Amino acid sequence: MPALPLIVFDVNETLLDLETMEPTFQRIFGDTSAMRLWFANLIMYSAALTVAGCYVPFTEIGAAVKKMLADTRGIKIDDRDKKELTEKFSTMPPHPEVPGALRKLRGAGFRLFTLTDNLLDVQTR
C-alpha cells in the first residue's frame, strides 16, 4: 500500500497570524516594525542555540530578545507589558484561510503535521 502524502507546517507566522501582535509592539516600542525585528531575532537565536545543541525554551528566548530590543532603544518594558506580549504570542489566532485550507487538505487525503519550538502548554492553547 502506498504511503499517504504528508505536509509538514511551521506554526508561528505560517499558520498563526503574527501581525496580531503589531498593536502591542506599536504601543510599547512606538514602531510596528519592532515586531518583525523581534521575531527575526527570535528565530535566529532559536536556530543558533539548536545548532549549538543548547536547549532554551522558546518563551525564554523571546523574553531575552524583547529585553535586548528594548535596551537598544532605551525602553523599559514593565511587567504588565511583558505579560501582554507573552499572552499575545501564546494566543495568536490562525490566519483566516488556515482552518478551511487544512480541512480541504485533510479531506484530500493528506496527513498534516506541524513543527514548532513552542512549549507544550503554548501548543495546546
Language-model segments: which ranges?
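Active-site neighborhood of HAD-like aspartate-dependent phosphohydrolases
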Residues: 1-43
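An amphipathic alpha-helix signature
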Residues: 22, 35, 39, 59-67, ...
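Short helix-capping segments at alpha-helix termini
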Residues: 30-34, 72-77, 107
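A broad detector of the eukaryotic-type serine/threonine protein kinase catalytic domain
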Residues: 43-47, 90
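A metal-dependent, Asp-based hydrolase signature
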Residues: 46-83
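Substrate-recognition element of Asp-dependent hydrolases with the DxDx(T/V) motif
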Residues: 80-93, 98-125
